[in-house]
């Protein structure tokens, strides 16, 4: 594993904040400002465990968690306050601004619209999507008119939206929309209700993208991996595939490498969310795989050869899987050694109490990453993204950001 022998990285936090960056694995409902969460809760009469930031940090959004279940506990509050169009627009706007303020030029914001929908109150798929897009676009337009872009030569800010289907939800307590789905399909098996909702999501995503020109750039499947394998959603991803909607899959976060294999072979994944278990053959549970280490090696080689990017979320993985222990044990080191296309991401800025710059700092303080490799990681964020423009525009934008990386590296004496 490529672990740094130095206790401190040569890259300062100032440099990391100034260099161009992208965050391609960023959950809206996990990335609210804590003071805004309190404001939204009061406005919408949502009960919180505390109405102070320190109180929320002590009780809900902790520095460390016992397990994935405790980590996910906070989403009941963030989703509750986001079932409001004003709050959705505010959250999206503030998320973009927070990224801009730390030098992030491109984000792909993902969330599950059906978790936030409440049709009885007029909060439909379309209104949810427009509220989020309005907030992101407002922040984009303001930044791209600023002196930072117009006079200082910084790259402009752009964004895309990734819609998440849910691997699992129950007949009550998840969202008004999901409760209504179970009522409508009361004679169906739960997994069939879940798959129906996922198909409704992808069809609506393609429709709104094509008819209303919203930058819905990708599909994701999120939620509990164990018991809800990717192959059950093959038809959903087939529809996305046939309609040029790009595809990422939460895979290998809490289940073995066979989950990653299914994401690639059953869901046509263009990118992988987390992918942590790729180099943990002990997490493989498929008894038909006799040589687990060999299986992991071959799968890793396939992913590297195909340049399928992995969205790496270090802090989140450490929090949801305490068994990792120290960051030096994280499989990011193996990803580097095996030359995988990796992208440093936050996952959830509030729940993990992190930023893109913080994630880079953690990675570079722990693993030996020379400047050329660092530039490669930055480049993957712009070359492997689901940019809402055409390929020529995407290439030009990536070129602009990487030229700016060289300028910043020169300023800090690395070139």
Q: Where in the sequence are the language-model features?
A:
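A glycine- and charged-residue-rich anion-binding loop/surface
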Residues: 249
């Amino acid at each position: 594993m490529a672990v740094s022998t130095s206790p401190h990285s040569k890259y300062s936090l100032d440099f990391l904040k100034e260099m161009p960056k992208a965050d391609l694995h960023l959950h809206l409902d996990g990335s609210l400002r804590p003071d805004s969460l309190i404001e939204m809760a009061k406005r919408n009469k949502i009960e919180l465990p505390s109405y102070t930031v320190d109180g929320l940090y002590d009780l809900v959004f902790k520095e460390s968690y016992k397990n994935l279940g405790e980590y996910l506990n906070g989403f009941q509050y963030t989703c509750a306050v986001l079932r409001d169009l004003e709050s959705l627009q505010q959250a999206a706007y503030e998320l973009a601004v927070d990224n801009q303020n730390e030098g992030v030029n491109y984000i792909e914001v993902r969330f599950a619209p059906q978790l936030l929908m409440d049709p009885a109150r007029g909060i439909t798929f379309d209104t949810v999507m427009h509220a989020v897009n309005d907030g992101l676009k407002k922040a984009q337009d303001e930044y791209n008119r600023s002196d930072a872009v117009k006079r200082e030569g910084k790259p402009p800010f752009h964004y895309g939206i990734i819609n998440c289907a849910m691997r699992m939800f129950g007949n009550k307590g998840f969202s008004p929309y999901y409760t209504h789905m179970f009522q409508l399909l009361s004679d169906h098996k739960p997994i069939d209700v879940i798959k129906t909702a996922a198909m409704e999501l992808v069809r609506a995503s393609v429709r709104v993208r094509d008819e209303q020109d919203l930058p819905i750039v990708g599909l994701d499947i999120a939620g509990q991996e164990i018991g809800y394998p990717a192959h059950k959603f093959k038809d959903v991803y087939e529809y996305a595939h046939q309609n040029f909607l790009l595809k990422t899959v939460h895979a290998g976060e809490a289940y073995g490498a066979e989950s990653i294999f299914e994401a690639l072979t059953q869901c046509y994944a263009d990118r992988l969310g987390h992918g942590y278990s790729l180099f943990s053959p002990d997490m493989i549970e498929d008894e038909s795989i006799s040589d687990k280490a060999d299986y992991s090696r071959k799968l890793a080689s396939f992913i590297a050869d195909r340049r399928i990017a992995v969205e790496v979320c270090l802090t989140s993985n450490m929090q949801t899987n305490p068994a990792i222990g120290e960051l030096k044990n994280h499989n990011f080191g193996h990803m580097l050694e095996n030359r995988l296309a990796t992208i440093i991401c936050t996952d959830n800025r509030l729940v993990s109490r992190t930023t893109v710059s913080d994630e880079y700092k953690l990675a570079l303080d722990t693993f030996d990453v020379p400047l050329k490799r660092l530039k490669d990681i930055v480049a993957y964020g712009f070359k492997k993204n689901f940019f809402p423009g055409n390929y020529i525009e995407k290439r030009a934008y990536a070129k602009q950001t990487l030229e700016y990386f060289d300028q910043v590296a020169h300023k800090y004496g690395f070139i």
